[in-house]
Amino acid sequence: MQARYSVSSPNSLGVVPYLSGEQSYYRAAAAAAAAGGGYTGMAAPMSMYSHPAHEQYQAGMARAYGPYTPQPQPKDMVKPPYSYIALITMAIQNAPDKKITLNGIYQFIMERFPFYRDNKQGWQNSIRHNLSLNECFVKVPRDDKKPGKGSYWTLDPDSYNMFENGSFLRRRRRFKKKDVSKDATKEDKERLLKEHNGSQSAAAQQQRQQQNQAQAEQDGSSQPVRIQDIKTENGTSSPPQSMSPALSAVPKIESPDSSSSMSSGSPHSIPSNRSMSLEAAESHHPHQQQHHHHSQGFSVDNIMTSLRGSPQGSGELPSPLISSSRTGIAPSLSLTYSPSQGSIYSPPCSQGSSSGGGAGTYHCNMQAMSLYSGDRSGHLTPANTPAATTVEETLPDYSITTTTSALSHGNQEHPHQGRLPSWYLNQTGDLGHLAGASYPGQQQNFHSVREMFESQRLGLNSSPVNGNSSCQMSFPPSQSLYRTSGAFVYDCSKF
């Protein structure tokens, strides 16, 4: 800006030079402003002008834009941030005896805070008012040992916690003696009430203990004899038995005739088959009795072991049971058992319980039992004896008696064989080796057994009594009705 406007003389700008005695004052002010930290960057270009008028403007601009520094007030003249109650409390607590006169309060405040050295009339009047109006300050009469003017002032003992955390800047609440008395009476009442309640609770507890002792003594005098206290001659406790040992050791055994006749609705049920030679079973197999006593259900293994282990027991079997076991009515038993009873049978042969079709599946132990019992009953009772006719009379719904006996004795002839398919007539001789063979519970010819059951099913379907028969068996769809080419050997341990 100065380069554009070259000033040759002050008259070209129309500025009249003002020369007076104040010119030296402005120069001094400008120098003071420059030395005092003003806008020195602006003063340097202005110094190009050598005319005193420019120096005058320069000093005015520098003083106008300079920092404003008012006259600082001394620290002693600042009013302290304490209330009059706080000032009086400071003076009392600073005294050696925790009590001080009114003149001593004045002297303490003026020595500590110089602000109160002036205008003594105003603040001293406020001090007197606060001493008389606040109940936290207590006036103590003067004794004769210390002569002087005025009484002592001290703090109330309950007012020491007026200020929070000992800071005189913050006061909790206005101290009132009535509140202190109310609090004291309230605390006394609560303390008395607690003591009264404690005495009452102690008395009630003592009375309850006495009642418990009296009741215990009464119970001890009239306590009945318990069953556990009754000792036998050996010193062991004997609980009462609801039934005799002979009855408790007898397992529940149902014959195939009774279950099949009940399921088919036939009135010809044989209740004598439920006994099933208990004397022979008790004398030869006590551990099996214990097992069946715990299971309380029908077990095919019991019949199997009774037929194998005790020939004299099998000789005592009634003829209807022998004939029915020979005729292979075991498939009808599967109609009366739910799948939840699959745990009765042995674990390796769990085909019947795992397939889910409880009404149409067969257990391998049952099949082996039926074949084995058929073989045993074959040489015990001939096929044409009255026992076979008894089964025919007892079970009118079954027309397959001589068909199965023809399977067991492969040389007999019967009119029902004419109704069977031609492929089955060629396979009747294959079952001849089953009579003398032993059947373990885990491996057998499963296809031969299945063909025997299929022949019974075909015989049932072709019999004239099949219209009203309730013993129809549903086979699982996984088993085909016709024999495929090749002999399949089923291992029950796989299932």
Swiss-Prot record:
Keywords linked to the UniProt accession: Developmental protein, DNA-binding, Nucleus, Transcription, Transcription regulation
Biased composition regions of type Basic residues, renumbered to the chain: 286-295
DNA-binding region in chain numbering: 79-173
Record-annotated membrane-spanning stretches: none
Keyword rRNA processing among record annotations: no
Broad class of where this protein is predominantly found: nucleus
Biased composition (Polar residues): 233-245, 297-313
SUBUNIT field: Monomer.
Name of the featured protein: Forkhead box protein C1-B
Organism whose genome encodes this protein: Xenopus laevis (African clawed frog)
Gene name of the encoded protein: foxc1-b
